[in-house]
């Protein structure tokens, strides 16, 4: 496979994720309305849609250690494009957050509650910039890898905390229980891979 075809495949994953996220958000707003209810449903739907891309990005290295094979090799090879696909999909989620904040709040949002999300989007933006090769080269490979590694841990942790909140505080089991179980499984895999000789 040529470098051009591989690069084209990466771009396709990102574009499809972004377009599908937009389509999903538009569908939710069309069916449930453009008010608070429709926007909230769109937020949940786009979060769920983006989650598999994040899981693939975060679990790739552990899968390669624990169960080497074609699937883990593909995930590891496409980890950058999966991460960018997550960023594209979650950008739609951010637009819906902005839409929700523009509506009459019920209940009004608290600054403390918004802080983790704001920080996470800042981290994610930095990761996207570092994924651009000239920027990564100017920053230095070691610093770029460190930012991507720490940023990925941060993003996955914040997403998991959101799932915990959805299950144990808001009791939205139908939406968040299965994703939470998947997130816990990924953490268990990474711990096992970390303890494995030559682990992550």
Feature names for model-found ranges:
Residues 2-200:
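Membrane-embedded alpha-helical bundles that constitute the cytochrome b-like, heme-associated redox core
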């Amino acid at each position: 496979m040529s470098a051009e075809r591989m690069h084209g495949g990466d771009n396709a994953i990102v574009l499809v994720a972004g377009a599908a996220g937009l389509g999903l958000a538009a569908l939710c707003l069309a069916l449930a309305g453009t008010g608070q209810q429709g926007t909230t449903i769109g937020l949940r739907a786009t979060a769920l849609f983006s989650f598999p891309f994040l899981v693939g990005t975060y679990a790739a290295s552990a899968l390669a250690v624990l169960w080497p094979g074609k699937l883990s090799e593909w995930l590891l090879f496409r980890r950058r494009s999966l991460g960018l696909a997550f960023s594209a999909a979650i950008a739609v989620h951010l637009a819906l957050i902005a839409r929700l904040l523009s509506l009459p709040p019920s209940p009004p949002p608290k600054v403390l509650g918004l802080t983790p999300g704001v920080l996470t989007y800042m981290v994610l933006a930095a990761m996207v910039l570092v994924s651009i090769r000239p920027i990564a080269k100017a920053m230095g490979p070691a610093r770029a890898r460190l930012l991507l590694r720490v940023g990925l841990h941060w993003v996955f942790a914040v997403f998991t905390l959101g799932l915990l909140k959805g299950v144990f505080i808001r009791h939205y089991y139908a939406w968040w229980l299965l994703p939470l179980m998947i997130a816990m499984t990924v953490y268990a895999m990474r711990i096992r891979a970390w303890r494995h000789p030559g682990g992550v």
